[in-house]
Curated annotation (Swiss-Prot):
Statement: the UniProt record of this protein carries the keyword Transcription: yes
Residue span of region VHIID: 395-462
Protein name (database record): Scarecrow-like protein 33
All residue ranges annotated as the GRAS domain in the record: 309-692
Keywords tagged on the record: Nucleus, Transcription, Transcription regulation
Family statement: Belongs to the GRAS family.
Region (Disordered): 289-313
Protein's cellular compartments: Nucleus
Quaternary structure and interacting proteins, as annotated: Interacts with SNRNP35.
Molecular function GO labels: DNA-binding transcription factor activity
Pfam families listed in its UniProt record: GRAS (PF03514)
Length: 694
């Protein structure tokens, strides 16, 4: 889409395992020595125990609410990552200078220091300056920023944001035919002229439309047909125009702040009005989870079960047609590919069932690959001006029906708190590769506020890729400002270090490590965007792992997307990514209605963009490169890390949480090779594990 999540006080307090240190673990397998990881010295009181699901949602909803209430949120950059932004900026700059873009660029970053007084102000107007030292309740706040000192711009020929894919039964033999027969060659060659001035003019027109008087002519029908009717190209244009019109404001301007406040109050009051949340340990669950091993060994490519939302109708096997089309595209058989795309278009829609939506986005990607414009389309999708508030709402919908990210965050935060408590840490330094909007950390901040004894200082080093424009670190700095405000509410001493540059170019001194602090390195599903040895002589993945090994962290917790669609061969990769996203679209179709606008936005901004990159891009432009959890396990061991076995009680409680809050027959939680695995209907999607340096 990057980059959403939710969580808090005592959100993990119920993970109190008196038998943790007895050394008995799962499946009678030989285990690693974990003598260096003692049980918690500071068990949390029973009266603070609460349901992890409710507290996690409460904290993150509060954090998202705080983000949405900011006055200029609509104009702020979206932090859901665009892995090609830096590369596109560098290429355009080198081309403007008449030089060749180097494969391995290692520019030195610029280091600047910004006082938190410029970023965080109290309601009364006072600020917390980095040079001020106060009491423990108003401890020193500091803010550092490390960003890439390099101007940025668009690709010289970007695809317009309103670009519409079309497939017709009759196509010209030239590559431009992919846009439809009505496009001439000159028009296609000059269609990428949407300048900043034009964008500002469009924005001004949209703002002016807010003040137009209401009339029947302005009323539109938001319903979208589920089936194709009439000519495909006309239907697609009407669908796009309807979508664009529906985004315009009503004639009478209404401040969204009140609406958002009411929406979040209804959610938060429900959580706070309850007298005492029932501890998950006291709730009644089955003695054993549904299955001992929930991940089936079904053959690759087996179709997911039909979802409850699907309706009966005779349609061709879209997956088979997509694979056949991919084979035709791979050998440049344009005639066959065009015919198959035309047939697929007749039975696909972004508003249909899971299979139809899947086919819609894969057809777009195959069409872009056939035209040779995959990178431009992906860049345009990544650069689309979608407001952060809309993205957050879509993400909130996702985490409300899918436990993947919630479970990964609970697992990581609980592990950090347990080990930090065992070490009696006074300062916790979290180095987060891919911090995005920082949704993972409010729950941990809330936990720190409930911690016994003296207050613990929190340091966070937020690492992100640079954004386009003259302020490449603006997004990651904004994340630090929000986290600082959250720490201020709970009187947690806080220090933030922002880094916006290529991850493989980060040096040890950039992280500003200090003696005696508890260092935890974390990454939530973002290592998949690092290039590997197939496209770079020095693998950025191994380089980042070696950097983490040099840090000598007290704990390293990678959360990975476990996938096998990183093969260099197109058809093989296409099959794997098709099976992977078949599960994800089926999951959305089972848990959300087709008309849900947030579902449509999430699938378009995240799934659709990722599919476009995997299918239509190659070389360094293909940044969606997941590996299986066993491949990441081998990489970590080669880099000098030792894996820590999972807590049996923790895995059991997470299973029960998913089974009680979600559909137990579809969402899977299990473990293998000391990895906590999550999946859908037997297919592994995400994995998390704990490592320490040798």
């Amino acid at each position: 889409m990057g980059s959403y999540s939710a969580g808090f006080p005592g959100s993990l307090d119920w993970f109190d395992f008196p038998g943790l240190g007895n050394g008995s673990y799962l499946n009678d397998q030989p285990l690693l020595d974990i003598g260096s990881v003692p049980p918690p010295l500071d068990p949390y009181p029973q009266q603070n125990l609460a349901s992890a699901d409710a507290d996690f949602s409460d904290s993150v909803l509060k954090y998202i609410s705080q983000v949405l209430m900011e006055e200029d949120m609509e104009d702020k950059p979206c932090m859901f990552h665009d892995a090609l932004s830096l590369q596109a900026a560098e290429k355009s700059l080198y081309e403007a200078l008449g030089e060749k873009y180097p494969v391995d660029d290692s520019d030195q970053p610029l280091t600047t220091t910004t006082s938190l007084a410029q970023l965080v102000s109290s309601p009364g107007g006072s600020s917390y300056a980095s040079s001020t030292t106060t009491t423990s309740s108003d401890s020193q706040w500091s803010f550092d920023c490390l960003e890439n000192n390099r101007p940025s711009s668009w690709l010289q020929t970007p695809i317009p944001s309103n670009f519409i894919f079309q497939s017709t039964s009759t196509r010209a033999s030239s590559g431009n035919a992919v846009f439809g027969s009505s496009f001439s060659g000159d028009l296609v060659s000059n269609m990428f002229n949407d300048t900043d001035l034009a964008l500002q003019f469009k924005k001004g027109m949209e703002e002016a439309s807010k003040f137009l008087p209401k009339s029947s002519q302005l009323v539109i029908d938001n319903s979208v047909p589920n089936r194709l009717t009439g000519k495909k190209s006309h239907w697609r244009e009407e669908e796009h125009l309807t979508e664009e019109r529906s985004k315009k404001q009503s004639a009478i301007y209404v401040d969204e702040t009140d609406e958002l406040t009411d929406m979040f109050d209804n959610i938060l009051i429900f959580g706070e009005a309850k007298e005492q949340p029932v501890c998950i340990l006291n709730e009644s669950f089955p003695k054993e989870p549904a299955k001992a091993s929930t991940f089936s060994k079904s053959p690759k490519g087996e179709k997911p079960e039909a979802s409850g939302n699907s309706y009966t109708k005779e349609t061709p096997d879209l997956r088979t047609m997509l694979v056949s089309c991919a084979q035709a595209v791979s050998i440049n058989d344009r005639r066959t590919a065009d015919e198959l795309l035309s047939r697929i278009r007749q039975h696909s829609s972004s508003y249909g069932d899971g299979t139809e939506r899947l086919a819609h986005y894969f057809a777009n990607s195959l069409e872009a690959r056939l035209a040779g414009i995959g990178t431009q389309v992906y860049t345009a999708l990544s650069s689309k001006k979608t407001s952060t508030s809309d993205m957050l709402k879509a993400y909130q919908t996702y985490i409300s029906v899918c436990p993947f990210k919630k479970i990964a965050i609970i697992f990581a935060n609980h592990s950090i708190m347990r080990l930090a408590s065992s070490a009696n840490a006074k300062t916790i330094h979290i180095i987060d590769f891919g911090i995005s909007d920082g949704f993972q950390w409010p729950s941990l901040i809330h936990r720190l506020a409930w911690r016994r004894g003296s207050s613990c200082k929190l340091r966070i080093t937020g690492i992100e890729l640079p954004q386009r424009g003259f302020r490449p670190a603006e997004g990651v700095i904004e994340t630090g400002r929000r986290l600082a405000k959250y720490c201020q509410k709970f009187n947690i001493p806080f220090e933030y270090n922002a880094i916006a540059q290529k991850w493989e170019s980060i040096k040890l001194e950039d992280l500003k490590l200090k003696e005696g602090e508890f260092v935890a390195v974390n990454s939530l599903f973002r290592f998949r965007n690092l290039l590997d040895e197939t496209v770079a002589v020095h693998s950025p993945r191994d380089t980042v792992l070696k950097l983490i090994r040099k840090i000598k962290p007290d704990v390293f917790i990678p959360g990975i997307l476990s996938g096998s669609y990183n093969a260099p061969f197109f058809v093989t990769r296409f099959r794997e990514v098709l099976f992977h996203y078949s599960s994800l679209f089926d999951m959305c179709d089972t848990n959300l209605t087709r008309e849900d606008p947030m579902r449509v936005m999430f699938e378009k901004e995240f799934y659709g963009r990722e599919i476009m990159n995997v299918v239509a891009c190659e070389g360094t432009e293909r940044v969606e490169r997941p590996e299986s959890y066993k491949q990441w396990q081998a990489r970590a061991m080669r880099a000098g890390f030792r894996q820590i076995p999972l807590e049996k009680e923790l895995v059991q409680k997470l299973k029960l949480m998913v089974e009680s809050g979600y559909k137990p027959k579809e969402f899977d939680v299990d473990q293998d090779c000391h990895w906590l695995l999550q999946g859908w209907k037997g297919r592994i999607v995400y994995g998390s594990s704990i490592w320490v340096p040798l």
